[in-house]
Swiss-Prot record:
Miscellaneous note of the record: Trichothecenes are sesquiterpenoid toxins that act by inhibiting protein biosynthesis.
PANTHER family referenced in this protein's UniProt entry, alphabetically: FAMILY OXIDOREDUCTASE, PUTATIVE (AFU_ORTHOLOGUE AFUA_4G13850)-RELATED (PTHR10696:SF54), GAMMA-BUTYROBETAINE HYDROXYLASE-RELATED (PTHR10696)
Organism phylogeny: Eukaryota, Fungi, Dikarya, Ascomycota, Pezizomycotina
InterPro entries, sorted: AlphaKG_dependent_hydroxylases, TauD-like_sf, TauD/TfdA-like
Keyword Oxidoreductase: yes
Highest taxon listed in the record's lineage: Eukaryota
Pathway stated in the Swiss-Prot or TrEMBL entry: Mycotoxin biosynthesis
Pfam family, one: TauD
Keywords associated with the record: Oxidoreductase
Gene responsible for this protein: SAT17
EC number(s) per entry: 1.-.-.-
GO MF annotation: an example: oxidoreductase activity
Full protein name: Taurine hydroxylase-like protein SAT17
Described purpose of this protein according to its UniProt entry: Taurine hydroxylase-like protein; part of the satratoxin SC3 cluster involved in the biosynthesis of satratoxins, trichothecene mycotoxins that are associated with human food poisonings. Satratoxins are suggested to be made by products of multiple gene clusters (SC1, SC2 and SC3) that encode 21 proteins in all, including polyketide synthases, acetyltransferases, and other enzymes expected to modify the trichothecene skeleton. SC1 encodes 10 proteins, SAT1 to SAT10.
Length: 385
């Protein structure tokens, strides 16, 4: 399947005030300066994986029994889910294995799929506890996913209710909550964690692409695009109280390549276009966005995201996308995921100051204040997602 083209640029609706570009958190000095090809384990291409056994870790019956025991023990404490951690969700044998998987996510391939849970056996709150408890071994901190918002959100098929949900939320209903193709992108946060409560009936495969492999491909075929990605791009924040900002799409910190790639902040979406006060995106930058999307598609790993799977990925090194999907009618058969954004104090990458400032805010809250949304409701997409 060819990569979907990026959206055309249009002007902002009447009444939207001109944004002011701030230089307070510029990362211009952190544009990538790496010399030569990247040969680390993160520079993989999809074709090198011979089968799902290369990246899918299957839970044994003993592992699942240990998870169920941890679930019961945590419920007996009466603690709120915000207190879920390796100390309160004890997995004596599985826990050390999960910590090794966290190392793979931070230092090797950059992603992993955990398989073997049966979400239909758990109640709604129990699925939340199980997912959050397991995930706490991958990253010990959870980030809020919008201003003063929850740390856990739902990705749900709202394709038949788009207009209703957008009016209800007074906001844009992101591609993640529709059945259409979800283009390659990165999000906010260090680790993106997804738990599949209900897979799509048809389609909806996950696509992952290594930014390190994309960089190597560009180095050989389009070095000019690398130079473009290192430029000072003007990002639309889509938040009236937050000024737009300037940041390259390819960054470097401590010798690590960091990719911060999205489409919406530069070209907008239907109904929520880019702020006209920022000016149109230069043609060579739009070409760079398209080129990265095309290469990501070419080099990507594609796999089925099955009911019960938990997917963990390094958001700083991997671009992700999703194929179009179809579901039967009825809430019980709609595609439904739970989502966490995480970081790990021990293994997290250091970030350039501007990016660090934005991401740190996600994790600066008390555990008592962590919110978990119990029923599927769309999250307002406000920060370029």
């Amino acid at each position: 399947m060819a990569a979907s083209p990026v959206l055309a640029t249009t002007s902002h609706p009447i009444g939207h005030e001109a944004a002011v570009v701030t230089d307070a958190d510029l990362d211009r000095h952190y544009a990538v300066k790496l010399a030569g090809k990247l040969n680390d384990e993160m520079a993989w291409v999809g074709q090198q994986f011979t089968g799902e056994e290369d990246f899918v870790v299957c839970l044994s019956e003993a592992d699942v029994a240990e998870v169920n025991a941890a679930l019961t023990a945590f419920q007996d404490t009466g603690l709120k889910p915000g207190y879920l951690s390796p100390e309160t969700f004890k997995l004596p044998k599985l826990g050390p294995k999960l910590r090794l998987l966290s190392q793979r996510i931070h230092e090797q391939e950059g992603f992993i799929v955990l398989r073997g849970l049966q979400p239909w056996r758990y109640r709604r709150l129990e699925n939340t506890i199980v997912f959050t408890g397991i995930a706490s071994y991958i990253g010990n901190r959870r980030g809020v996913q919008c201003a003063d918002g929850p740390v856990m959100t739902h990705i749900f098929d709202y394709s038949t209710e788009v207009e209703e949900k957008e009016k209800l939320n007074d906001g844009y209903l992101g591609h993640a909550n529709r059945t259409s193709y979800l283009p390659f992108h990165t999000d906010d946060g260090h680790i993106i964690s997804l738990y599949c409560l209900q897979a799509a009936d048809i389609g909806g495969r996950t696509l992952l692409a290594s930014s390190h492999a994309i960089y190597n491909h560009l180095l050989e075929t389009r070095p000019d695009v690398i130079e473009t990605l290192k430029e000072e791009w003007i990002w639309d924040s889509f938040i009236p109280e937050k000024p737009s900002f300037i940041r390259p799409l390819l960054l470097e910190q401590d010798g690590k390549l960091i990719c911060n790639y999205r489409i919406r902040p530069f070209l907008g979406t239907p109904g929520y276009p880019r702020n006209a006060a920022l000016g149109p995106l230069p043609a060579h930058q739009e070409e760079a966005l398209n080129t990265v999307a095309e290469i990501a598609e070419k080099l990507s790993l594609k796999f089925e995201f099955k009911t019960g799977d938990i997917q963990f990925l390094n958001n700083l090194s991997i671009l992700h996308a999703r194929e179009e999907f179809h579901c039967a009618k009825g809430d019980t058969t709609r595609r439904h995921l739970l989502r966490l954004v995480q970081m790990d104090d021990e293994l997290a990458w250091r970030l350039p100051p501007g990016l660090s400032k934005d991401m740190d805010k996600m994790f600066q809250h008390d555990l008592e204040e962590e919110k978990f949304i119990w029923s599927p409701e769309p999250l307002p997409y406000v920060i370029g997602q």
